[in-house]
Regions:
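Conserved short "hinge" loops at termini or chain/domain junctions
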Residues: 2-93, 97, 153-169
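Amphipathic, non-membrane alpha-helical segments in soluble helical-bundle scaffolds
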Residues: 35, 57, 102, 106-110
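Non-transmembrane, amphipathic alpha-helical segments
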Residues: 52, 97-104, 139
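A short linear-motif detector with a strong N-terminal bias
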Residues: 91, 99, 144-146
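Short loop/turn elements at secondary-structure junctions
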Residues: 104-169
Length: 169
């Protein structure tokens, strides 16, 4: 939630006359993951996906946990193979580092962020029946599709698979 302050007309106003004060960020504890995959910090998800304080912490936490569970399920066989090869964490699996972070961990967090955000957007669509509302819904649908695509691509990158499989019929 946000606080919106609208000054009275008689008060001197500069600019548009409204000041938006975002709700102070509360304490959002890191979400613990399984032993193999990294924990997820809700603050990083908010920053990466530009969610700021527009989503309640409880809703964001639920969406992230769902994203983690689904991504973990998608990577179950990959995880089993890597554990059999002697790796105890995703961060231990050989991969390039960018900015001091394993590419595999980066893509894992990207997959979770994309899925959590897609899930939130699907549930936050408006019920506006006007032409403007329809156009906005189409734009949101496109964004949701792109987020699901990003999730699939990130999961493929973790597994060193191509982003898409094309076959001739």
């Amino acid at each position: 939630m946000m606080t919106l302050i609208i000054p009275r007309k008689e008060a001197p106003v500069s600019g548009e006359g409204t000041v938006v004060i975002p709700q102070p960020a509360g304490d959002e504890p890191v979400i613990k993951n399984t032993f193999f995959f990294p924990d997820i910090d809700p603050k990083r998800v908010r920053e990466r996906m530009r969610l700021e304080q527009t989503v309640a912490p409880a809703r964001l936490r639920e969406a992230i946990k769902s994203g983690m569970a689904e991504t973990n399920a998608e990577l179950f066989e990959f995880r089993e193979q890597k554990i059999a090869a002697g790796f105890t964490r995703l961060a231990d699996v050989p991969a390039d580092d960018i900015d001091g972070e394993s590419i595999k961990v980066f893509y894992y967090e990207r997959a979770v962020c994309a899925m959590a955000t897609a899930s939130l957007y699907e549930r936050y669509r408006g019920v506006d029946a006007s032409a403007k509302g329809d156009k906005k819904a189409d734009s949101i649908d496109s964004t949701i599709d792109e987020l699901w695509r990003d999730m699939r691509w990130a999961v493929a990158r973790i597994q060193d698979k191509p982003r898409c499989i094309v076959s001739q019929i």
